[in-house]
Curated annotation (Swiss-Prot):
Species this protein is from: Schizosaccharomyces pombe (strain 972 / ATCC 24843) (Fission yeast)
InterPro entries: RasGAP_C, RasGAP_CS, RasGAP_dom, Rho_GTPase_activation_prot
SUPFAM superfamilies per record: GTPase activation domain, GAP, RGC domain-like
GO terms under cellular component: cell cortex; cell cortex of cell tip; cell periphery; cortical dynamic polarity patch; cytosol; division septum; mating projection; nucleus
Site residues, Arginine finger: 195
Entry-linked SMART domains: RasGAP (SM00323)
Protein's recorded name: GTPase-activating protein
Keywords of the record: GTPase activation
Length: 766
């Protein structure tokens, strides 16, 4: 492209530079038509209607994804309670909470916000939160764990809820960069950063639940998953003791005399067991190769945001931990891409719209084993972490290298910062911004910010000023009043728009140039097919004159505006009037010639997203059915339970229930237990706090809200807390059924079953 020499503007004096390089780094045609959609265009050709259809489809997927996310969260919560309900071990108040969750209306009705003045203030607040990610980044790092899921839902599905809109996607990625950078700088153990249950890992996991990520998983894993699911009775468990018991139960092997004392090592030497493991390993590897090949061959389909996060992880690791090996960095990236993104979909395919119903036990175990093999390959530990027959190790090693090559290539994507700058300018200057949120989501965001306000932002910050005017947050409204409102975003401080003039990256010249290109493409689409002005090489003044001659006042104005833009660009020396207004003419020609190909690409994208939308709607029906089943359970259980004032009495201790008797329970519902007690009962497995000593430390446990707990560690004689962590009951329940039932909270490690029973004894039966 020829260098453009800019003239002098009142705003700044630009250097002689290659303008609009940012548009060279992305498909500018798509951008132009996004802009075109936001303008009240006179063009309503087939391209316009197709692009509008695609735009609406993306909006529907974004909206439905949020609704499914909320449903999945509540199904998980109710699923964790259903066992207690069936066993008649749920207190009356918990049953009321259970019933409330079942009666919630998941299809929020649109309405209006009850206070117009506060609506404008909230519009200014959410404008700041959306356009300046630093505010949310500070909040995410400090919010209490029991508020984390609610905050992430609002961030991912409301504040940045347009999941296919580049500006909001790039702002969200900017948020990730801020949070991850801070976490990487603060950690001493980078290897566990993305594997432990931290705010960062939960944020990244929630991000993968958005529409683009789920669409990708469906496109590459659907067939693989269903090829496994069509064989519900196929046994492919390769754990030696499990294989041994299967062979004994089916009469293929006589039981050993010391059957209950056998170990994995011993039974793995039995010829029948060894042969069975070898046969099953061969089948497992064949299936696993299909999954891996599907992922390895799909790098160009992986959403940009997922790849950019992988790039960010690699860059941060290289900068802050330069001595870490490349294979370890690949393992770190695999801790996000496979552990948080791909493998959860394999383990629970029904939650990712990959199966229409729950898999059989055999299929579930097979998929879990496949996911485990894939993760060990990504971690570079396939030779030590699987029970596969040793003869298959060379093939696993070969795939380790292939997977690591993929993990290296994932980060080979460009940055978005210049594109975001232009998107910000266009969004803030050319269209009204708005969010759709429920009343309670607005109030909850207000409450969370207010709780953390003094520790987050400068007292003179704009957020502080708005919160002072808003005052205390309102209490949540009943579900019937929790309507969905449109929240117009209000740019109260012009300085919040990116300082384009200072950075000299996107300037007035850039915007004029983009406007001109957009307008001339639009004019070409207005002219009849075969019109002389549409023939290449294009004559831009002829195009403008031809449209001006059409019998329409609005079209005449467009033609005049096109001539004015050419004159202005020529005066600014951004185009060469003596050389056919180059380089603008060449760019318009290229975009015009590529219209047919672009039309086909958009049609293919629309068709693919229609399939995704159908799957999301089907999954919504499945989740609604689950809630109906839980409702039946609740009604049945309630009919059998007689009200009692001694809910906590009469429970016998089951196997593994801890026998700790707390020394004192404070009025604030805080329980104090010694480290020795917790160690003796094997509740506490490990503590890596530097100041920790079993003899002179103690723990406090509290439950600030239903199913959320705070654990704090103190030194005797000191009031300052050494470590304080928050954990929700769902996380403990999930770890109880893991192969290694351990709850890792960073400095503290607990046995999941013992910790659950401790919570049950102290809080859940009250």
């Amino acid at each position: 492209m020829t260098k453009r020499h800019s003239g002098t503007l009142s705003s700044s004096v630009l250097p002689q530079t290659n303008r609009l390089s940012l548009l060279r780094n992305r498909e500018s045609t798509s951008v132009l038509y996004t802009i075109d959609l936001d303008m009240e265009s006179d063009v309503e050709d087939a391209f316009f209607h197709l692009d509008r259809e695609l735009h609406d489809l993306k909006q529907q997927i974004s909206s439905q994804s949020k609704q499914n996310f909320v449903l999945e969260r509540d199904v998980r919560y109710l699923d964790s309670k259903i066992a207690l309900l069936i066993q008649n071990r749920m207190a009356q108040e918990e049953q009321h909470e259970f019933a409330k969750r079942l009666n919630d209306n998941y299809n929020a009705v649109k309405g209006s916000f009850p206070d117009d003045r506060k609506l404008q203030l909230y519009g200014a607040l959410f404008f700041l939160l959306q356009s300046e990610p630093a505010y949310i980044a500070s909040l995410v790092r400090r919010v209490k764990l029991f508020n984390m899921d609610a905050l992430l839902q609002i961030v991912m599905f409301n504040i940045y809820g347009n999941q296919y809109e580049s500006r909001e996607e790039h702002l969200l990625l900017s948020l990730f960069q801020m949070v991850l950078t801070t976490e990487f700088e603060a950690t001493s153990d980078v290897l566990s950063l993305l594997r432990a249950n931290t705010p960062v890992s939960r944020m990244l996991t929630t991000y993968t639940r958005r529409g683009p990520g789920q669409a990708y998983l469906r496109s590459i894993l659907y067939q693989c998953i269903n090829d496994v699911a069509i064989h519900p009775d196929l046994q492919l468990d390769i754990h030696p003791l499990s294989v041994y018991r299967y062979l004994v139960n089916t009469g293929q092997l006589s039981p050993s005399e010391d059957d209950n004392l056998l170990t994995n090592e011993e039974v793995s030497e039995f010829p029948a067991v060894k042969n069975a493991i070898q046969e099953r390993s061969a089948q497992l590897l064949l299936l696993t190769k299909r999954f891996l090949d599907a992922v390895l061959n799909s790098i160009d389909e992986i959403p940009y945001g997922i790849r950019w996060v992988c790039k960010l992880i690699r860059n941060l690791t290289n900068r802050l931990f330069p001595s870490i090996s490349d294979s370890t960095i690949c393992s770190l990236i695999g801790g996000f891409f496979f552990l948080r993104f791909v493998n959860p979909a394999i383990i629970s395919p029904q939650t990712s719209m990959l199966l229409d119903s729950c898999p059989s036990d055999n299929v579930r175990k097979t998929l879990a084993t496949i996911a485990k093999i894939i993760q060990s390959v990504a971690n570079g530990t396939s030779s030590t972490k699987t029970h596969l027959d040793v003869s298959f190790q060379p093939m696993l090693k070969e795939y380790e290298e292939k997977v690591h090559n993929l993990l290296r290539k994932l980060g080979n994507v460009g940055d978005f910062f210049e594109a975001l700058e232009l998107d910000q300018y266009i969004a803030l200057s050319k269209k009204s911004l708005a969010l759709e949120m429920t009343v309670n989501e607005i109030y909850l965001t207000h409450e969370i910010i207010l709780e953390n306000l003094d520790n987050l932002y400068d007292p003179d910050s704009h957020v502080h000023l708005i919160l002072q005017e808003l005052g205390e947050p309102c209490k949540s409204v009943p579900q019937e009043d929790n309507c969905l409102v449109t929240l117009p975003l209000y740019n109260r401080w012009d300085s919040s728009i990116p300082d384009l003039k200072q950075n000299l990256k996107v300037t007035r010249e850039d915007i004029l140039y983009v406007d001109a290109k957009t307008l001339f493409i639009q004019l070409l689409r207005l002219l009849p097919s075969g019109h002389p002005a549409t023939r290449v090489p294009l004559d831009l003044p002829l195009i403008a004159d031809s449209v001006s001659s059409l019998k329409s006042m609005s079209l005449m104005k467009k033609g005049i505006r096109a001539i004015e833009l050419l004159d202005e660009l020529s005066t600014l020396r951004l185009v060469d009037k003596e050389n056919r207004y180059e380089p603008l003419t060449s760019e318009v020609e290229k975009e015009f010639i590529d219209l047919d190909a672009l039309y086909e690409r958009i049609r293919a994208e629309r068709d693919a997203l229609q399939d995704v939308h159908r799957a999301i709607c089907d999954h919504n029906e499945y989740l609604q059915t689950q809630l109906q089943i839980y409702g039946s359970y609740l009604n049945n259980a309630r009919s059998q339970i007689k009200p009692s004032h001694s809910d906590s009495k009469g429970f016998s201790r089951g196997v593994g229930v801890v026998g700790i008797k707390p020394k004192n329970i404070k009025s604030s519902n805080t329980v104090k237990l010694s480290s020795q007690q917790l160690k003796k009962e094997s509740v506490l497995l490990n503590c890596t706090i530097p100041e920790f000593n079993v003899s002179n430390t103690y723990f406090t446990f509290s439950s600030p809200s239903t199913d959320n707990f705070v654990i704090a560690v103190y030194q005797r004689g000191h009031s300052k807390v050494l470590v304080e962590v928050c954990i929700c009951l769902d996380d403990v329940l999930q770890r109880r059924y893991a192969s290694n039932p351990v709850v890792d909270l960073g400095f503290l490690t607990f046995e999941a079953n013992k910790l659950y029973h401790l919570f049950e004894q102290l809080f859940l039966r009250k």
